Swiss-Prot record:
EC number: 2.2.1.2
Gene3D superfamilies in alphabetical order: Aldolase class I (3.20.20.70), EF-hand (1.10.238.10)
Domain EF-hand: 329-364, 365-388
Binding annotation for Ca(2+) 2: 365, 367, 369, 371, 376
InterPro entries the record matches: Aldolase_TIM, EF-hand-dom_pair, EF_Hand_1_Ca_BS, EF_hand_dom, TAL/FSA, Transaldolase_1, Transaldolase_AS
Keywords: Calcium, Cytoplasm, Metal-binding, Pentose shunt, Repeat, Schiff base, Transferase
Predominant location: cytoplasm
Cellular component terms per the entry's GO annotation: cytoplasm
Record organism: Parasynechococcus marenigrum (strain WH8102)
Known role: Transaldolase is important for the balance of metabolites in the pentose-phosphate pathway.
Binding annotation for Ca(2+) 1: 342, 344, 346, 348, 353
Cystine crosslinks: none
PROSITE patterns: EF_HAND_1 (PS00018), EF_HAND_2 (PS50222), TRANSALDOLASE_1 (PS01054), TRANSALDOLASE_2 (PS00958)
Name recorded for this polypeptide: Transaldolase
Length: 390
């Protein structure tokens, strides 16, 4: 009998939400997505150290021996994203998503320039535009940047999408793909209402993606919908038929191990809802975001989390560059990661405190108890971690 993964793949493009090349080979998805948190997690795997070193050496050579470490690391971030992307494209038949620095999320011009640079690096490596999606946060500034890039033939994936206003603005901008975050929407509602769980059809994240999908298909928008950030199998199966679903290796394993029957829930040829079409300009976008506390909270939180992941990766790259060049290593990088995330200082990090991505949290949470201990973080990042107390 066909597995849940086989059945889902027959009606939806399954995308691997990971930077781990071995996990991608294992599940043979058609696309793959990356972000700074996933690259950070992959960078801890010894097998990929040569890719990191390649990027650092290339960046040093590009900007010169006299350049400060910070400049080399900044250049290497783009190189690393593209190097991992190139390796992923050797495995998946379609596309990889590579993310713009989240710290540029409110700067249209800087986002445009970064998108152009990333696609140029791919082009220089012989990768055509149609195999790459540039991931940009769904701020108004990010959406406007994507609109410009799309007109230049650079395809974009608008991420950190939580509100309907964001979705409509993205479609009107003609972006290639949007990534509404199912699980993070659920997290917010659980925290806000005090409910422990929601049945699949009542899951707020599922309802949000279903609404966006049906709206796009009803009014003929070409923008693809890729549900992301899943917490459980019910969320995934309730969105069977969505254009794409990007799924972590942990949940892909569960899908592959189940032979339960799957029915299609979303149908592009027969969308439901009949919602009135609207136009979203800057004023309406701001008004819709202001009226949607969940979308505002989660967008800001997501940008902050991805920004922190980039900063952590920068620390680790500086450490490695110092090792490669015979300099002094950064011995406190992992301690800084822990102290930064341990908001209440109780010696552990909960999922709510964690500023990075869910995929990294899951990878570090070795005993799957929903709490990261210093030992788990030490093992996960491969560095000594010493906590000091007042």
């Amino acid at each position: 009998m066909a597995t849940l993964l086989d059945q889902l793949s027959a009606m939806t493009v399954v995308v691997a939400d990971t930077g781990d090349l071995e996990a991608i080979r294992k599940f043979t998805p058609r696309d793959a997505t990356t972000n700074p948190s996933l690259i950070l997690a992959a960078a801890q795997i010894p097998a990929y150290q040569s890719l990191i070193d390649e990027a650092l050496r290339s960046s040093r050579k590009l900007i010169g021996d006299a350049a400060p470490v910070e400049d080399v690391v900044h250049e290497a971030l783009d190189e690393i994203s593209v190097i991992f992307g190139k390796e992923i494209l050797k495995i998946v038949p379609r596309r990889v998503s590579t993310e713009v620095d989240a710290r540029l999320s409110y700067d249209t011009d800087a986002t445009i320039e970064k998108g152009r640079k990333l696609i140029r690096l791919y082009n220089d490596a012989g990768i055509s535009n149609d195999r790459v999606l540039i991931k940009i946060a769904s701020t108004w500034e990010g959406i406007k940047a994507a609109e410009v890039l799309e007109k230049e033939g650079i395809h974009c994936n608008l991420t950190l999408l939580f509100g309907f206003g964001q979705a409509v603005a993205c479609a009107e901008a003609g972006v290639t793909l949007v990534s509404p975050f199912v699980g993070r929407i659920l997290d917010w509602y659980k925290a806000d209402t005090g409910r422990d769980s929601y049945p699949g059809p009542e899951d707020p994240g599922v309802i949000s993606v279903t609404r966006i999908f049906n709206y796009y298909k009803t009014y003929g928008y070409k923008t693809e919908v890729m549900g992301a950030s899943f917490r459980n199998l019910d969320e995934i199966t309730e969105l069977a038929g969505c254009d794409l679903l990007t799924i972590s290796p942990k949940l892909l394993d569960q899908l592959r191990e189940s032979d339960a029957s799957l029915s299609q829930k979303l149908d592009a040829t027969n969308p439901s809802g009949g919602e009135e079409q609207i136009h979203v300009d800057r004023e309406r976008f701001d008004a819709m975001m202001a009226a949607d506390r969940m979308a505002t909270d989660k967008l800001g939180e997501g940008i902050k989390g991805f920004s922190k992941a980039i900063e952590t990766l920068e620390h680790q790259l500086a450490h490695r560059l110092a090792e490669l060049e015979g300099g002094e290593a950064f011995r406190h990088a992992v301690q800084e990661i822990f102290m930064l995330n341990d908001m209440n200082g109780d010696g552990c990090i909960t999922r709510d405190e964690w500023l990075g991505s869910d995929a990294v949290f899951d990878a570090l949470d070795l005993d799957h108890d929903g709490r990261l201990t210093p030992e788990e973080v030490r093992k996960g990042f491969g560095a000594a971690l010493t906590l000091t107390t007042a």
